[in-house]
Structure formats: structure tokens, C-alpha cells
């Protein structure tokens, strides 16, 4: 997996936890006026996330940090719409810069239980065979990004 993100920790949050908080906030008493910043229970780098996926699937997957300029060029070469490229570039240069390196108690406050850990999500998803599609990291969903990885 090739992305323009270094060793910044992210509080990966399970989409099911987000949905559960939304349902609770919209259907249960006691949530009016509350603000729930939802995060996973721990910080994890993208390299760490890839390592957990590799371990759970038994597949050899590696993470490679690439320069943002090369990543953007690969997206443009793949003919992604310019506005999509801008959003992705902003995400990687302004949002994934360390400002999110914190864990909150939003899920616990909203649901009365801890957030689901990324490792649990990975084990559950791997058991379903979702990542057994056969595409290699070098091929990727965007061939130009795969070619960038091959060149490194």
C-alpha cells in the first residue's frame, strides 16, 4: 500500500461505532445537546494498520510512504476528477498531519461501551474473506499508484 502519510498516529474508528452513535443520538433520550467526537480506542500509524491487516490475512502486504507530489501525479494520471484530487491532497497534507493524534471518550459516553478496536475489525473482516480478492498491493485500485510503488 502506497500513501503519502508518515508515522502520524490516527485514532481509526469503526464505521459500525459511528453508526451506533448516530442511531443512539437520534433515537434515545439523553443525547440532546451532546457533542460526541468519535475515535477508536488507540492511535495507529498507517504502517501499523497495514501490518495488522497483513497479519490477519496471512498475506504479505507492505506499506510504503510516497511523496505527496508523486501520489497526486499518479491520481491525475489515473484521470481522477480535479476536485477529487484536490480533496485527497487536502486530506493527506492538512488532515493527516498529526492534529488527530488523540483518543476521545465519545463512543463510550454515547453508548456506554468502549469503541471497537481496529484489530477486532481486521480479524472480523479477514474472516469474511473480503481481502482475498487476489489484487496485489502493486496492482492496487489505481494502476498508476501501483506503478509508482513498483518504481520505488
Model-found features: residue ranges?
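Oxidoreductase cofactor-interface core, primarily capturing Rossmann-like NAD(P)-dependent enzymes
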Residues: 1-62, 66-84, 90-97, 145-152
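Conserved active-site and cofactor/substrate-binding residues in soluble primary-metabolism enzymes
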Residues: 13, 44, 102, 113-116
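Short, amphipathic alpha-helical "lid/cap" segments that border enzyme active or binding sites
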Residues: 15-23, 104, 118-123
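Short alpha-helix boundary/capping motifs
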Residues: 77, 81-82, 102-103, 134-138
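Short helix/strand-capping connector loops at secondary-structure junctions
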Residues: 100-109
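Amphipathic terminal alpha-helices
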Residues: 106, 114-152
Amino acid at each position: 500500500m502506497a500513501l503519502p502519510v508518515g508515522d502520524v498516529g490516527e485514532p481509526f474508528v469503526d464505521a459500525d461505532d459511528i453508526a451506533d452513535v448516530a442511531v443512539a443520538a437520534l433515537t434515545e433520550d439523553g443525547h440532546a445537546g451532546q457533542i460526541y467526537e468519535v475515535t477508536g480506542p488507540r492511535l495507529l500509524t498507517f504502517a501499523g494498520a497495514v501490518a495488522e491487516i497483513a497479519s490477519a490475512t496471512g498475506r504479505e502486504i507492505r506499506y510504503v510512504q510516497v511523496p505527496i507530489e508523486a501520489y497526486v501525479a499518479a491520481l491525475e494520471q489515473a484521470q481522477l476528477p480535479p476536485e477529487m484530487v484536490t480533496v485527497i491532497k487536502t486530506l493527506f497534507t492538512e488532515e493527516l498531519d498529526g492534529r488527530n493524534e488523540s483518543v476521545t471518550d465519545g463512543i463510550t459516553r454515547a453508548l456506554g461501551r468502549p469503541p471497537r478496536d481496529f484489530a477486532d475489525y481486521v480479524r472480523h473482516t479477514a474472516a469474511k474473506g473480503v481481502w482475498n480478492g487476489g489484487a496485489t498491493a502493486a496492482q492496487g485500485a489505481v494502476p498508476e499508484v501501483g506503478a509508482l510503488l513498483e518504481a520505488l
